[in-house]
Amino acid sequence: PGARADLRALQAAGVDAVMFGNENDRPYEFAVDTASTATMAYVVGRLRPEIAVPFGVDVLWDPMSTVALAAATGAAFVREIFTGSYASDMGPWTPDAGKALRTLQRYGRGDCAMLYNVSAEFADSLDRRPLPDRARSAVFSSIPDAV
C-alpha cells in the first residue's frame, strides 16, 4: 500500500480526478509545519509522471499551505474550507478566502480551480444561518469555482 498503489488503483478504476491530502496528519494544525507541505510536494512530484487525470491538493485546516502546494505541484484544483468562522477542539478558526485566492493568483495559478468546502468536519460553524444560505453567501462573496 501507499500513494503509488492508491493512484494506480484509482486510475485503473476510471476516476475523473484524484486528490492528495494530509487526512491522517494528526493532530491537525491551522498553520501546518513547512515540512508537511514539502513532503506532500515531494510525493506528488514523484508521482507526477504517472498521474493521468487532473489532480488536486488539500492541506487540511491550512488554506495558505493548500494554495502554495497547488502552485508548487501544478494541481488542477484545491479543496479546503476558505470561508466562515468556526469553533473547534483546536480553538477558533477563521480562514481568509481573499488572501488565499490572491496568493494563488500571485503564484501565477489563476487557472487552478478553488473548490470550497462550506461545512467543516470536526468544527462547528459560528454562523447560525442554514448551510444553504452560507453556501450562497460564499458563492457571492468569495467567488469559488465550486462549493
Predicted regions and their residues:
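Alpha/beta enzyme core
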Residues: 1-29, 38-53, 62-147
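Charged, often glycine-rich, active-site loop that binds/positions anionic groups
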Residues: 34
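Acidic carboxylate-rich catalytic motifs and surrounding loops in phosphoryl-/glycosyl-chemistry enzymes
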Residues: 59
